[in-house]
Design a protein with these regions (language model features):
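Bacterial Sec-dependent N-terminal signal peptides
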Residues: 1-20, 68, 559
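Transmembrane beta-strand segments of Gram-negative outer membrane beta-barrel proteins
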Residues: 15-41, 50-55, 61, 77-81, ...
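Outer-membrane beta-barrel proteins
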Residues: 17-21, 62-65, 75-79, 90-97, 107-109, 179-182, 267-280, ...
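Exposed, low-structure sequence patches enriched in small/polar residues
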Residues: 25, 48, 52-54, 74, ...
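Short alpha-helical segments and helix-capping/turn motifs at coil-helix boundaries
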Residues: 54-56, 100-105, 143-148, 189, ...
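Outer membrane beta-barrel
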Residues: 73-167, 203, 294-315
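Hydrophobic, small-residue-rich alpha-helical packing segments that form membrane-like cores
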Residues: 144-146, 154-201, 206-235, 242
């Protein structure tokens, strides 16, 4: 399809603009010991693999029409394709992730009034509580719909979107096919409307007030299944709904530094494997209020959700096949020890989540700011369960606490060539709820980071971290040194020591040494690592990463 579009564009529209873009990405691991593959194929059943890798090749052809004046005229065409070579992927990905072939094909035409896309399409309605189709390669998520998408802007301030198709899950890992897509046998579809009230009220524009409202409807269709449940008087068959619909309304307001958002979603009864075949309807409420001006930013948010797991297949578990993505109100830390206990959103059982943040900057040449200024950030996040199924009440019992994160961070430029950051963090982490085993972990973490510009060509950065807890694996100490050379070469080393906590959690030494080189659009990194097991999370969705040791190599190129 891409080659056909390219030939047509060159032959028929030579006076317009045609260009090609794309990228190559390779992430590999040579483990010290060959690992047993979890992917079974007729050619290699339970093979021992000494090289694991994730590989992607993206290619896009763009046609831009130079003269597109007039209503309804074509402005451009874009064709996208992606080749995936993940026959033996990195550790921690779900079994169905393994596969190879053409992972995505799409064709999009842009007009004055909107756009039409066919093939494999992504999309998001509102904050994503009903529909959020996206790709995250770190987690192994690629949940597009194979179908079509229509965006229409009939009038300024009005935008309509319709989308539908079959959702991709993973590759068909039991067949050696180059075109081995594995997607839902049934369909999902949705419509969305955004209305900018300020576009119809000139005085709002003049006062800098932006008010918008929106609504969405998403539904899925599934064929009936023969699922049985045993009761004291015999076996019974579930009466499963074939159509499941969900609706959402929202409103947002921005005015003079203030930003407010209210969003409510409701989902009809949808018995699935994830929610224990419950016929209880689902609902979610999101409230957000923020204010910002020079030197000050304040944020307060709250979210209630109950039974809001929305999948294209009622039998699906894990990371694949999810239609929605609930906003997460917990921080995503970048420091290694602070990220040991990340939170995963509880879709089926529900939760109340609260978050508040205050950021203040003292200006230059002030008593608190010093010569270069100082920034302090205070943030707190707290997640609790629901008192009972379908309840709006917060579970205030001891077991009702799911997650707590309270931290203070100080950023200061000490001198012309020295920047420093200090952070203190307290976390409460309910392992039984979040990962399915264990008890409550209460941990305190301290971080000190320094960055020194030695010369214009040499920069040194270091991190010193300490985590203390009496539960789980015990205490951690971590040190990182990183040297940037000539703005193209980075050499780093990190060492972490875990004291352990009894026979179940023995002490351990973990380390990483690596070098990364960047030239124009090329980036190559090589290293040796021994990592502890843990979770990689983004947006409240987590992937378990087992302990691993070996040589790592990554390469990326974009044009």
């Amino acid at each position: 399809m891409v080659l056909l579009l390219c030939c047509m564009a060159m032959g028929l529209w030579a006076h317009d603009t045609v260009y090609v873009s794309g990228g190559i990405q390779h992430d590999g691991l040579f483990p010290t010991q060959p690992v047993s593959s979890y992917r079974t194929t007729p050619r290699a059943p339970w093979a021992k693999i000494d090289h694991l890798s994730n590989n992607y090749i993206d290619l896009s052809v763009h046609y831009l029409r130079m003269d597109s004046a007039g209503a309804g005229h074509l402005r451009g065409i874009q064709a996208d394709t992606r080749i995936e070579l993940n026959q033996w992927p990195l550790l921690g990905y779900e079994p169905g992730f393994a596969g190879h072939g053409i992972g995505r094909l799409s064709l999009k035409a842009d007009f004055d009034w909107g756009s039409i896309s066919v093939g494999d399409v992504y999309g998001q309605f509102g904050s994503g509580m009903l529909l959020n189709l996206y790709e995250n390669r770190d987690l192994g998520i690629d949940n597009y719909l194979r179908g079509a998408k229509l965006d229409v802007m009939p009038y300024k301030g009005i935008r309509l979107t319709a989308i539908g198709g079959k959702q991709r899950r993973y590759w068909n890992c039991y067949e050696d096919r180059a075109w081995g897509w594995n997607y839902a046998q049934d369909a999902a579809m949705g419509v969305n409307m955004e209305l900018g009230i300020h576009d119809f009220v000139p005085v709002m524009h003049q006062e800098g007030i932006h008010l918008s409202v929106g609504g969405s409807y998403v539904s899925k269709y599934e064929h009936d299944d023969t699922l049985l449940v045993y009761q004291p008087d015999g076996w019974y068959r579930y009466n499963l709904p074939r159509w499941v619909g969900a609706g959402e309304v929202r409103a947002s307001l921005q005015a003079k530094g203030w930003d407010a958002l209210v969003e409510y979603a409701y989902k009809a009864n949808d018995p699935t494997a994830e929610n224990g075949m419950s016929y209880r309807p689902g609902q979610a409420l999101l409230l957000s209020l923020s204010y910002s001006r020079k030197g000050l930013a304040v944020l307060a948010q709250a979210k209630h959700s109950d039974n809001m797991s929305f999948r294209s297949s009622r039998n699906q578990r894990g990371l694949a096949g999810r239609l929605n993505l609930l906003p997460v109100f917990t921080p995503q830390h970048t420091y290694s020890l602070a990220a040991i206990y990340p939170y995963a959103t509880q879709y089926a059982t529900g939760e109340w989540a609260f978050q508040a943040e205050l950021r203040y900057t003292w200006g230059k040449k002030t008593k608190m700011g010093g010569k270069y200024g100082t920034t302090v950030k205070l943030s707190a996040a707290h997640v609790r369960g629901l008192r009972s199924e379908g309840s709006w009440a917060v579970d205030m019992s001891a077991g009702g606490e799911y997650y707590t994160d309270v931290n203070i961070e100080l950023n200061k430029r000490v001198s012309r060539n020295w920047w420093t950051t200090a952070m203190l963090l307290y976390q409460a982490y309910n392992q039984q709820v979040i990962v399915g085993k264990g008890g409550m972990v209460r941990a305190g973490t301290a971080v000190w980071e320094n960055k020194v510009k030695i010369t214009d060509q040499f920069t040194l950065r270091n991190e010193l971290q300490y985590l203390f807890t009496r539960q789980d694996a015990g205490q951690w100490l971590s040190l990182l040194l990183e040297l940037d050379l000539w703005q193209c070469l980075t050499v780093s080393g990190e060492y972490s020591y875990n004291t352990g906590n009894g026979s179940e959690h023995p002490s351990g030494h973990y380390y990483t040494v690596a070098a990364a080189y960047t030239h124009d659009a090329h980036r190559l990194s090589i290293g040796y690592t021994k990592n502890n097991d843990g979770y990689n999370c983004a947006g409240g969705v987590c992937r378990y990463m087992p302990e691993q040791e070996g040589v790592t190599m990554s390469y990326s190129f974009n044009w």
